[in-house]
């Protein structure tokens, strides 16, 4: 299945948009669309690893106690149990492809 990811991107005025791209019994693929100033608050997943790949824009990603600035083409892995989150501190939209494995029970 081919997906034109950037064509699916849409921002929401009040919070980060999370768009489901694909799901299997072993993985979940989402697109996060983050407007300037929006964030995903730090949180943890007990059993899931999360992989972030930045497609467009720039943002600050928290991983444990560390912060990393990522731009288009950069990636970051948040292992299960490690607190993580992100904020768009740029002035353009931030698009991030996110792979979660295994998928959460509600997926």
Task: Give the ranges of each region predicted by the language model.
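A short, N-terminal "cap"/entry segment at the start of jelly-roll beta-barrel domains
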Residues: 1-30, 41, 77, 107
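Short strand-connecting beta-turns/loops that link adjacent beta-strands
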Residues: 25-26, 47, 91-92
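Structural motif
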Residues: 28, 58-60, 67, 83, ...
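Short, conserved beta-strand element in jelly-roll/cupin
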Residues: 33-35, 46-61
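Histidine-centered divalent metal-coordination motifs
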Residues: 43-45, 84
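Short acidic-glycine-tyrosine-enriched beta hairpin
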Residues: 66-80
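Ligand-binding loop in jelly-roll beta-barrel domains
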Residues: 80-105
């Amino acid at each position: 299945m081919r997906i034109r990811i950037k064509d699916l991107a849409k921002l929401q005025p009040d919070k980060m948009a999370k768009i489901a791209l694909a799901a299997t019994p072993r993985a979940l693929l989402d697109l996060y669309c983050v407007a300037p100033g929006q964030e995903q608050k730090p949180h943890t997943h007990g059993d899931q690893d999360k992989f972030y790949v930045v497609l467009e824009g720039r943002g600050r990603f928290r991983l444990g106690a560390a912060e990393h600035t990522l731009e288009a083409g950069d990636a970051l892995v948040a292992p299960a149990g490690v607190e993580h989150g992100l904020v768009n501190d740029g002035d353009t939209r931030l698009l991030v492809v996110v792979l979660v494995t295994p998928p959460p029970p509600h997926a």
